[in-house]
């Protein structure tokens, strides 16, 4: 039975990843910040672990709990949009977005990626097309854009570090999805996005290590 790790599974894309992988017979390890969310994930059949991605001690504790695991696929989903205005960001707003979207990845990927080496597994982060510099046509959401561009950089560093060990690391844009962040007017349901993301990750080959991909598997400019 293959094993998948989903970091940030309390709702939205992460929660649907748990549901779909379990439906396909995978063993699922999933994290959430609140115990109530962990209890719900456990009811779906996942091994649920509490994790606050903004807390270094919590991340270190996760590493201990995952010791000796061999994982076939891992998804880093946890993220926040931050302020909807494009004015002067406060220090608190900056820290919330950058700590959640960037610093967490810098701390988590070195813990998670080695667990994929034995299986020559695949590690994916949920980024956003808004983080693309080459395709940027609007300055809206500047703090979120900056955080996702930085996340993509962290992903490439992981690809360079762990690719030689057989791990394939990729960054995905999930599409405009009907989640709390995307809103009800988004073009994709959570089910549609996750179905495509899973299929695209399954199709990724090691030669694509370090790629930035759309949910349908097509490349996105950095």
Locate predicted features.
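Structural signature of the Rossmann-like NAD(P)-dependent dehydrogenase/reductase core
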Residues: 6-7, 76-77, 122-128, 168-173
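Conserved Rossmann-fold cofactor-binding substructure of NAD(P)-dependent oxidoreductases
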Residues: 53-69
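Conserved glycine-rich Rossmann-like NAD(P)H-binding loop of the short-chain dehydrogenase/reductase
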Residues: 24-39
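N-terminal Rossmann NAD(P)H-binding glycine-rich loop of SDR-like oxidoreductase domains
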Residues: 10-22
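Rossmann-fold cofactor-recognition segment
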Residues: 43-57
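Catalytic loop of short-chain dehydrogenase/reductase
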Residues: 80-98, 106-107, 120-163
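C-terminal helical subdomain
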Residues: 164, 171-174, 183-222
């Amino acid at each position: 039975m293959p094993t998948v790790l989903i970091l940030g599974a309390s709702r939205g894309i992460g929660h649907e990843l748990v549901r779909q992988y379990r439906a396909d017979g995978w063993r699922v390890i999933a994290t959430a910040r609140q115990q109530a969310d962990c209890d719900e994930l456990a009811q779906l059949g996942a091994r649920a672990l509490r994790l606050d991605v903004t807390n270094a001690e919590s991340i270190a504790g996760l590493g201990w709990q995952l010791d000796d695991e061999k994982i076939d696929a891992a998804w880093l989903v946890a993220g926040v949009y931050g302020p909807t205005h494009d004015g002067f960001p406060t220090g608190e707003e900056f820290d919330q977005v950058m700590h959640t979207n960037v610093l967490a990845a810098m701390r988590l990927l070195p813990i998670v990626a080695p667990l994929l080496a034995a299986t020559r597994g695949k590690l994916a982060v949920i980024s956003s097309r808004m983080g693309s510099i080459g395709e940027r046509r609007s300055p809206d959401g500047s703090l979120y854009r900056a955080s996702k561009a930085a996340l993509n950089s962290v992903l490439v560093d992981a690809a360079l570090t762990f690719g030689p060990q057989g791990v394939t690391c990729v960054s995905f844009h999930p599409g405009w999805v009907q989640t709390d962040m995307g809103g009800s007017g988004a073009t994709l349901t959570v089910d549609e996005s996750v179905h495509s993301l899973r299929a695209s990750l399954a199709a990724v080959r090691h030669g694509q290590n370090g790629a930035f991909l759309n949910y349908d598997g097509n490349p996105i400019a950095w």
